[in-house]
Amino acid sequence: EKENENMARVKSQKSQKRRKAFVRFLPIYILMLPGLIYLFINNYMPLPGLVIAFKQYNAGKGIYGSPWVGLKNFEYLFTTSDAFVITRNTILYNVAFIVINTTLAIAVAIILSELEGKRKKVYQSAILLPNLLSTVIIGYLVFAFFSVENGFINNTILKALGKDPVSWHSEPKYWPFILTFLRIWKGMGYGMVIYLATITGIDPSLYEAAVMDGATKWQQTKHITMPCIKPVLIMMLILDAGKIFYSDFGLFYQATGGIPASLYNVASTFDTYIYKAIQSSAPIGKTAAASFFQSVCCCATILLTNWLVKKVDEDSAII
């Protein structure tokens, strides 16, 4: 009986602790609630619709009443001439974005960490501001700069240099550089803030000891800053690798003015392909197959990247 009483007392104490912990963290749970609802609605509720990729979807029969076609929708995706173009563009653009964006974000964060006072906050805000801009606004900015008749570059810069105006939207050779610049300009501020916060959290005594030993700024960066931000850097790279088959639809579609035929080979990605396929009344099963393939590739990429990281440094892996 005493043992039963002791067990009951222990259980009662544990339940009380749980209740106290729940009440203590209730404000945090409430703050999490909108995000969890958004995640559930946008990421989990659509999951049953994955079967559309394997069906000849008929709106009248519904998702589960439509006939199965197996992998025929995927066959269509891989046999079309667009498959190579959209896969190549999506991967190459994302690799360029990750490498350049990460390098510049770390470099700018290190430079800003050396500044003090109002200048630091001004530079931080200026670099982060483009990240807050809508891609629609960026599309209008691109039009203002690259319009053939009224664009700033043609009417001001090229005119002053005595050069003929350029029909930018008819010249695909320029757009890999334009799109890369726009993506870095828009996205670098986010990474910079994360790396700057990590650098700010490094123990100042490490730098003080390095200065006393006569270490240069480069040596401090190499032997103190970089090792300290390494876990965050690896985590960011793994998360970026998970999005390597996704593209910024707004950037590619809005900045190019809807991807005209002249820019199709340099600006088409998985996301723009799916959108245009839906617009052209293509069978929903085929567009669902493209989206499903995209998701599977992203999942495989993040697992592969995490596995490689675990082989090199197990503590830095996120799974």
Where are these regions (language model features)?
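A structural signal for multi-pass alpha-helical bundles of membrane permease subunits
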Residues: K20-I319
